[in-house]
């Protein structure tokens, strides 16, 4: 288990599928209950924004939109300037892993099995999860920081 500061700035990255973002909402409340003084930011793509924007446990929602090179540079620059303490990549794709890395957060959590796992400094092994439902993977990631 990784110890994080009580007032940590936490970023959850979940891009792509709306259905996967729905699964991901199940981790917001346990995170806030475990770290009530933490700031929780969720990063999603535009189609999923409305699913999470009014969630009571989220302090901020960032919306990634593919656009011009300049707009992407501005977006990544914003991620770096935010100075997150903990970033959890719940996406499983290259873009989420790169975003996680570019935050320069001291704690970057992601999937151990991914070829891009070198971008994380805390990795979660999923081979022992039974059954392997999407929510099991999400929960395993937040357990890494002590969420029960």
Predicted segments — roles?
Residues 1-148:
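Catalytic machinery of carbohydrate-active enzymes
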């Amino acid at each position: 288990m990784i110890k994080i500061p009580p007032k940590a700035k936490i970023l959850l990255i979940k891009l792509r599928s709306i259905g996967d973002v729905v699964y991901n909402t199940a981790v917001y409340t346990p995170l806030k209950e475990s770290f009530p003084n933490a700031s929780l930011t969720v990063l999603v793509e535009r189609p999923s924004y409305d699913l999470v924007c009014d969630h009571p446990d989220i302090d901020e929602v960032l919306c990634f939109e593919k656009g011009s090179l300049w707009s992407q540079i501005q977006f990544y620059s914003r991620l770096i300037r935010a100075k997150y303490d903990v970033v959890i990549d719940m996406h499983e794709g290259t873009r989420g892993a790169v975003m996680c890395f570019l935050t320069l957060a001291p704690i970057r959590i992601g999937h151990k099995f991914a070829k891009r796992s070198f971008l994380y400094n805390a990795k979660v092994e999923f081979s022992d999860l039974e059954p392997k439902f999407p929510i099991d993977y999400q929960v395993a990631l937040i357990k890494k920081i002590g969420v029960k």
